[in-house]
């Protein structure tokens, strides 16, 4: 799956999104697909997606929210949705990065979904802090760099099996169009 011509994420795999703008990054990636987006968030989480902010990225009617009551059900929901292969994007907000075995199960479920379902699903794990989910296909970090009259983000690919670390400046012009320009890695955020 490619977004904005340069952001490439292999389908039928699980990817980790981190940083203060990880929700916006998930919505940006969802905008590059068609069909429903399943967003899994813990029932005890204090915040929910705001429809007006969702509308900046995708049609809010595409969004389906699941709110499991138990922590172990978050990954179960994600795994089953990926295995079904009927939802192109499955997002899970997790309280902590999952270990290797559950991530491997997500990859296998997504591969099964791609072979049996109607689409090759994209699994997005949203982690707080710098993340650290073991075994993810890629790890991305996005943080806002807004200023007076400027809507911009710093986006990094921090880990990928088949690509080196890289950074971009993502910006939105006054007409709402997004542009992606190469950026230098900032030393204080590089790594992980």
Label the predicted regions.
Residues 1-192:
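N-terminal regions of ATP-driven nucleic-acid and macromolecular assemblies
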């Amino acid at each position: 799956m490619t977004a904005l011509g340069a952001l490439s994420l292999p389908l039928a795999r699980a990817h980790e999104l981190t940083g203060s703008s990880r929700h916006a990054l998930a919505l940006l990636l969802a905008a590059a697909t068609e069909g429903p987006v399943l967003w899994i968030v813990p029932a005890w989480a204090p915040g929910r997606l705001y429809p007006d902010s969702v509308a900046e990225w995708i049609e809010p009617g595409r969004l389906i929210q699941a709110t499991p009551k138990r922590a172990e059900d978050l990954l179960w929901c994600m795994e089953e949705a990926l295995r079904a292969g009927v939802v192109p994007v499955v997002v899970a907000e997790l309280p902590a990065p999952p270990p290797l075995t559950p991530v491997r199960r997500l990859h296998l479920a997504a591969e099964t979904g791609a072979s049996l379902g109607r689409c090759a699903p994209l699994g997005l794990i949203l982690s707080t802090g710098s993340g650290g989910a073991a075994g993810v296909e890629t790890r991305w970090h996005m943080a806002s760099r807004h200023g007076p009259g400027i809507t911009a983000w710093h986006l990094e690919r921090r880990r990928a099996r088949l690509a080196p670390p890289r950074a971009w400046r993502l910006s939105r012009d006054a007409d709402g169009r997004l542009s992606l320009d190469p950026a230098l890695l900032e030393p204080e955020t590089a790594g992980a």
